[in-house]
Amino acid sequence: MKKRKWATLSAVVGTAVLLLSACGPGDDNSSGSQPASTGTKTLLVWEDVKKADGIQDAVKEFEKQHDVKIKVVEKAYADQIEALRLDGAAGTGPDVITMPHDQIGSAVTEGLLQEIKPDQKVIDSFTDESIQSQTVNGKLYGLPKSVETTVLFYNKDLVKKAPTTLDGWYDLSKKLTKDGKYGFVAKWDEIYYAQSVLGGSGGYIFKQKSDGSYDVNDIGLNNDGAIEGGEYIQKFFSEGLFPKGIIGEQGINVLNSLFTEKKAAALISGPWSFGPYKEAGIDYGVTELPTLPNGKHMSSFLGVKSYNVSSYSKNKELAEKFVEFITNEKNSKKRFEVTEEIPPVKKLMKDPIITENANANAVSKQTKYATLTPNNPEMAEVWKPIDSALRLIATGRTDVKKAFDDAVKQIDSQIKANHSK
C-alpha cells in the first residue's frame, strides 16, 4: 500500500511508546526479546499509530497466561518494515510488527519475516483472501489484522439519495459543479483509486494464476478494458468535473478539504476517513462503489493489515503465539470495538457488530468486488509509472493509450532490471 496515502489525514505522530507491562518510565531498553532482570521473557511489539488501545486488554491477558512482559511501541504501520531493516540488524528491533500486505513479498525476499505455522483451524478462521495476502511461495508469514478498501462517501445534506451508478454521479456532478463547488470527486490520477474504474473495465496489474501467484509478464494496464476505463476517467477531468487541484501528490489534501468544507457532495475514500470526516462535522453516508457504464461494479484494491513475526526475534515461538492470540475472534472483536478496523475473521464478518455498523458494512460489501493489491516484490515497480501516466491523462497532455503503453513498457523494463533471477 502506498505510504503517502496515510500521512495526509492527520499530522505524522512521532514514535509513541506505550508500556503495557512492568517496564517503568526509567526503562530505556527498546530492544526486543531481551530477558528482564527477573528472568521473565519480554516481547517488543510494534503497533500502528493510535491503535495500541485496541490491544491493551489482550496484551495484559497474554502476559498473565505466558509469564511474559510485553512492550508496545506505536509506529506508522507502513513504515515499520523500513525501520525493521535497521533495528533488526542492530539487535534492537521488534518481535512482532504490523504492516500492509503489499510489502510482504519484498520483506520475505529480504529475509525480514519469519514463516509461521499455525494450526489449520486457525488459518480457516480467516477469509481466504486475507490468508492469501500473507502467503508467499506457499508459505505463511503472518495473520490478518484488518481489511480495508475504498468506498463512496456522500454528504447527506447535499445528496438526499445517492446514485447507484457512476453515470448517475456524472449527471449529478454536471448539475452541482459551479462556483468552486463540485458533485462527485475522486483521486483518479493515482492507481490506488483509479483501479476502481480500470479494474471494473477489465484492466489489471498482473494476471493472477490459479495458485494465487502473479504472472509479472502479463501486465493488463494497457489492455482494451484499461484504455476504456482511462478514457472514462479523462472525461471527468476534461469536462471540469474534477478540480485541477486534486492532481498530484498533495491533491489528496485538496480532495479531503473539498469534502470537509462541504464543497464536494461525494468522494471515494476509505476507512481511514471515518474518524476525520466525523470530527469535521460532516453528516455523511457510506456505500459500496457504484456500477460502471458496462453494468459491472467498480472494483477496488483490497488491503490487508497483518501481524508478523520478525526473523530477528529471539523468541519466535512465543511471538507466533502472540500473533495467533491477538488475531483470534475474541480479541479481533474487541479491537474492532475500539479502533473500527475491520477484522477478516469469518464469524465476525457475519456478526451484528459488523453488519449493523453502516461504515463497516459498506466496506464489507465492497470487498466482494475488490481484488488484493499484489504482494509480490515486482509490485514496487508499478506505482510510479502508472501514476505518472494517470496524471498525464488527467491533465490532457497525452492520449490514454500512449500513456498506458509507455507506463507498461517502463514497468516491464524495471521488473527485468531489478527482479530477474
Predicted regions and their residues:
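Extracytoplasmic "Venus flytrap"/periplasmic binding protein-like
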Residues: 61-126, 135, 141, 157-160, ...
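Extracytoplasmic/periplasmic substrate-recognition and gating elements
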Residues: 60, 64-65, 69, 278-338
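Short, solvent-exposed loop/beta-turn-alpha elements that line the ligand-binding surface or hinge
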Residues: 118-126, 204-228, 279, 291-300, ...
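Hinge/lid segment of periplasmic solute-binding proteins
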Residues: 101-151, 161, 166-173, 197, ...
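Conserved N-terminal structural module of periplasmic/extracytoplasmic solute-binding proteins
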Residues: 2-20, 24-105, 293-295, 317-318, ...
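A structural signal for short loop-to-beta-strand junctions that line the ligand-binding cleft
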Residues: 87, 94-95, 123-156, 182-187, ...
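Glycine-centered hinge/linker elements that transmit conformational signals in sensory
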Residues: 173, 215-247
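Long, aromatic- and glycine/proline-rich binding clefts that accommodate carbohydrate-like moieties
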Residues: 287, 336-392, 416-420
